[in-house]
Amino acid sequence: MNEYVDNEARKVKLVGKTVTMAHGAGGRQTSELIDMIFKAHFDNPDLTADDAAVLTPPIGKMAVSTDGFIVSPAFYPGGNIGKLSICGTVNDLSCMGAKPLYLTSTFVIEEGFPMEKLEEIAEAMEKTAKEAGVRIVSGDTKVAGKGQVDGVFITTTGIGEITDGVEVAGNLAKPGDAIIVTGDIGRHGCTILLAREDFGIEADVTSDCAPLWGNVKAVMDATHELHVIRDATRGGVGTVLYEIAGQSQVGIRLDASKIPVAPEVRGVCGMLGLEPLYLACEGRLVIMAPKEQAQTIVDALKACPYSKNAAIIGEVTEEQPGKVVMLTEIGTQALLPQPGGELLPRIC
């Protein structure tokens, strides 16, 4: 039995304590760390039974995805590395048309990391996993020496069940497809940039980090005529569009006036000379589907949390395969530059 089931008593025990090398050595302190924090938030029969979870496989095809998270700072407006580690893998599965079912998680923790902060991370993971409808069924914890890790790094692996009748992939975009984004873009990247306090800029910007299976399911319930679903993480919407254009060997034409950007994000980008299209999102999707289905998809998205600002922002074309062209707000067309180099490191 877990002696730390009394939540208030458990939290009192964490005050002022830090993770030590002994917590990663496999002995009594390791068991205490697991009981005090991880079992308190992730406890379920699959997780606590043995070293590996024994699961019943889905009837149909499965999707598997893994992702590592090293975001800096680990805590930011709208989330933390724990919430992000659930959303990132859940969303990767969702973009394959797969209902997320199970997750595993690995923590690499720096010696001296505050227990209360680790508790906050685990609490966010528990809450987000419940919202996404997934169970954490296996995990591992390692402790690295001071300075060998920056705080805490997390890796999650997810398993999902592919929905019958849905096939989506980056190489399936077709000329004539409408291009949809599920909300205003660039929030997460802008939030992380401001949280680092390198520029002395203050703005009321919150990360869009969110689990998006519910949004994807709503779209699939509305229509199975879908070609591409991608989450616009590192490199933002612009990078994702270039990847799809290359994979499908199609051209992409965007309408700048239709791309939703929050005023506060646009303001920060204006001051720093950044393009919102290249800033990461952690709660936004890019969807490509026949234009006849576009409004149906947007209507379905607007009925869901996290996608009230969904919009049709462009179309897939036969011209200039592999390129992304922008129709500017003054009516001219410009080739969108393909991003390269280090855009914004450690945003996820």
Give the location of each predicted region.
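Helix-biased detector of long, well-ordered alpha-helical tracts
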Residues: 1-348
